[in-house]
């Protein structure tokens, strides 16, 4: 396949055109007065969104050189979204500014490597300042609500929903987003630990109306192999039955012979018993059984530990306040495990989350963490039309991610003010040479850009507002939603520090690569010959009877 190659200023100019095309489409969504972008879909209604990364993902340019530039900035937006969950539009605006001003200087003869060094120096200083401005959220759910509301494009109802969901399942809990059947947005909470395995036989059901097996204060037997013959099972079954308490059996599987015996006993002697399969597969199954054991204060009966089923005693069984088993799910509420053991297990899973690189593993570990630390909340997003539903779901997702980032690294004043305050840290900062100092000035100018854009989207003059905010101190800034200058912290206009930091770091990283690019290679478009026309005279079959 033949390639097209461009060098120096030609290459950089084409890349910049692509950057501008993408950034101009994305930046109109920034801030409380951000505009909508309508995206045509091949099938169904067009998608209306204010989510920067959704817009960025849709941009594909016809010119290969320009498209390369656009794709690079798209990667800034995506990476910021992945790392911090929000701030995609801010990162795009910052990248556009650094690239734009930087290229002017490179064209005027500045050394790109020195510019990059200056940019990196300035970014390090700004990041330091952002960290020092950050205020930890702790257990203050009012602040959590503010962050969520701002990220959901200033929708206080979404902010309240997310804060309520976090109250119910703790900050470590898993919160998932699903589409509601009606127009209302509501929260559903599954308390305790739930896993997706139901009863092995419908004869275990105690509540025939709901088709559920409900047990109060049951013993819980956790076994990591298949229960195939009853002989091994009887030594633990008999004392459990004599105690008069129900018994929940969690095992890899229960053979038909053993299952039949359990069912017959259940029906004849009203033996309160239920058997379910263990959740998960392979190593994940072992880990989940261990989680259940820690939560209920029991032990996993496993031959790996030198324990056989016939050696099991009542002391090895877990217990809890209540178990509900349906056709598809088992829920364990208020396990009797020791608090410190559960906390230790939670810390262990958190450490695994930090160390894993796979998104899939991270998601699964996060689920396990939630099940141990309080439960799972589901936000059911409702809207009047499918188009509105998609747009609202985007915003709820943004808000949820931003809230998690705020819990991690704290909050800073929103509305681009954190960057303006951070620029004070650049006063008097000099590079080792003139070009490095220019690099520092590029960042100083770029970090004003988010505020300028927020103001421009609100229909005001950016330069005037930036000057006024710069004259203020601390949390003083411009609230674009209400069009007043005030203490943004008090007004609830706050951003997660992590989002602010990650957006700048990623933007500067890609922009630095741009400035030091000397050659771009793309695939040459081949002109395909047009399809030949059909043979003449085939238009009709005239004259045939």
Curated annotation (Swiss-Prot):
CDD domains (UniProt xref): GroEL
Catalytic activity: ATP + H2O + a folded polypeptide = ADP + phosphate + an unfolded polypeptide
Keywords assigned by UniProt, alphabetized: ATP-binding, Chaperone, Cytoplasm, Isomerase, Nucleotide-binding
Gene3D superfamilies associated with the record: GroEL (3.50.7.10), GroEL-like equatorial domain (1.10.560.10), TCP-1-like chaperonin intermediate domain (3.30.260.10)
GO molecular function: ATP binding; ATP-dependent protein folding chaperone; isomerase activity; unfolded protein binding
Listed GO CC annotations: cytoplasm
Keyword Cytoplasm: yes
Cited Pfam families: Cpn60_TCP1
Binding site for ATP: 29-32, 50, 86-90, 415, 495
EC number: 5.6.1.7
A GO biological process held by the record: protein refolding
Assembly with partners or alone: Forms a cylinder of 14 subunits composed of two heptameric rings stacked back-to-back. Interacts with the co-chaperonin GroES.
Function: Together with its co-chaperonin GroES, plays an essential role in assisting protein folding. The GroEL-GroES system forms a nano-cage that allows encapsulation of the non-native substrate proteins and provides a physical environment optimized to promote and accelerate protein folding.
Homology family: Belongs to the chaperonin (HSP60) family.
Stored PANTHER family: 60 KDA HEAT SHOCK PROTEIN, MITOCHONDRIAL
The protein's name: Chaperonin GroEL
Organism: Phocaeicola vulgatus (strain ATCC 8482 / DSM 1447 / JCM 5826 / CCUG 4940 / NBRC 14291 / NCTC 11154)
Gene: groEL
């Amino acid at each position: 396949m033949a390639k097209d190659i461009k060098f120096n200023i030609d290459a950089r100019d084409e890349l910049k055109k692509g950057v501008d095309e993408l950034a101009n489409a994305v930046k109109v969504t920034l801030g409380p007065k951000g505009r909508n972008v309508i995206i045509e879909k091949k099938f169904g209604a067009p998608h209306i969104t204010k989510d920067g990364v959704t817009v960025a993902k849709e941009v594909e340019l016809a010119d290969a050189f320009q498209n390369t530039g656009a794709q690079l900035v798209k990667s800034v937006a995506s990476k910021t979204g992945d790392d911090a969950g929000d701030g995609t539009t801010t990162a795009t605006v910052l990248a556009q500014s650094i690239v734009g001003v930087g290229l002017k200087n490179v064209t005027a003869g500045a050394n790109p490597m020195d510019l990059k060094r200056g940019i990196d120096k300035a970014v390090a200083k700004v990041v330091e300042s952002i960290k020092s401005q950050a205020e930890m959220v702790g257990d203050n759910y009012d602040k959590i609500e503010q962050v969520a509301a701002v990220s959901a494009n200033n929708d206080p109802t979404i902010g309240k929903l997310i804060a309520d969901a976090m109250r119910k399942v703790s900050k470590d809990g898993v919160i998932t987003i699903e589409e509601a059947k009606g127009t209302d947005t509501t929260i559903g909470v599954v308390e305790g630990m739930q896993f997706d395995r139901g009863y092995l036989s419908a004869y275990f059901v105690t509540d025939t109306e709901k088709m559920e097996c409900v047990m109060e204060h049951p013993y819980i037997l956790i076994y990591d192999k298949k229960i195939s013959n009853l002989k091994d099972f009887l030594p633990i079954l008999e004392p459990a039955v004599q105690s008069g308490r129900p018994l929940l059996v969690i095992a890899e599987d229960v053979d038909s012979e053993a299952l039949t015996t359990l069912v017959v006993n259940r029906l004849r002697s009203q033996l309160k018993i239920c058997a379910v399969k263990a959740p998960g597969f392979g190593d994940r199954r072992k880990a989940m059984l261990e989680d259940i054991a820690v939560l209920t204060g029991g032990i996993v009966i496993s031959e790996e530990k030198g324990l056989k089923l016939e050696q099991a005693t009542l002391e090895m069984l877990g217990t809890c306040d209540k178990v509900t088993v349906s056709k598809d799910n088992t829920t364990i509420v208020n396990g009797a495990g020791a608090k410190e053991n559960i906390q230790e297990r939670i810390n262990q899973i958190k450490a695994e989350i930090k160390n894993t690189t796979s998104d899939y593993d991270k998601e699964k570990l996060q689920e396990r963490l939630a099940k141990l630390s309080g439960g799972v909340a589901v936000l059911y997003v409702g809207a009047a039309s499918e188009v509105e539903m998609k747009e609202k779901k985007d915003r709820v997702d943004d808000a949820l991610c931003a809230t998690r980032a705020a819990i991690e690294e704290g909050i800073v004043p929103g509305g681009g003010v954190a960057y303006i305050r951070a620029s004070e840290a650049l006063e008097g900062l000099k590079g080792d040479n003139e070009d490095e100092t220019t690099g520092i000035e590029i960042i100083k100018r770029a970090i004003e850009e988010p505020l300028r854009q927020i103001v421009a989207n609100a229909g005001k003059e950016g330069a005037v507002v930036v000057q006024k905010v710069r004259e203020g101190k601390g949390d003083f800034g411009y609230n674009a939603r209400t069009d007043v200058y005030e203490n943004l912290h008090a007004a609830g206009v706050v951003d997660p520090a992590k989002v602010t930091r990650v957006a700048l770091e990623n933007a500067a990283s890609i922009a630095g690569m741009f400035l030091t690019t000397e050659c771009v290679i793309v695939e040459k478009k081949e002109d395909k010959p047009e399809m030949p026309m059909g043979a003449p005279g085939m238009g009709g079959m005239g004259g045939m009877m």
